[in-house]
Amino acid sequence: MIWNESIECMDRESLRKIQSIRHKKTVERVYHDTPFYRKKMQELGVTPDDINSIDDIVKLPFTTKYDLRDNYPFGLCAVPMSQIVRIHASSGTTGKPTVVGYTRKDLSAWSECLSRAFTAYGAGSSDIFQVSYGFRHPDVQRQYGEADYTDA
């Protein structure tokens, strides 16, 4: 079953081209709008000009849970807080809470991604899901796919 034919049936070369374009835009955004990522990239001697395809992902630094905690609460945001429409946070049981902010575009992307996943494993609009979860942010993200999933 196919959710988004234009993406899911795209030839490999076209898909990699889209991935490369979006990857480069993301790197440019975080480099220019997030001091944390700019510093991490500069420490590695990497600039957005060094990122030309999805294959260049190996040039970029990792982001760890400690990075998220050390920049608590919003030090890694690449957009103004006025664009954040939803915030998810861990309980902080093992340290500072891990906070992630989402824009409307982020939530739409999650919905699209999860709708594709539900469709790929055969779910249809007449199926019933039970998703039992804690309130960790990855679990809450699944709600967006479930809420927007209407038909296969």
List the model feature ranges, each with a label.
Residues 1-89, 94-112, 116-120, 124-126:
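Nucleotide 5′-phosphate-binding alpha/beta core
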Residues 115-151:
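Conserved AMP-binding loop of ANL adenylate-forming enzymes
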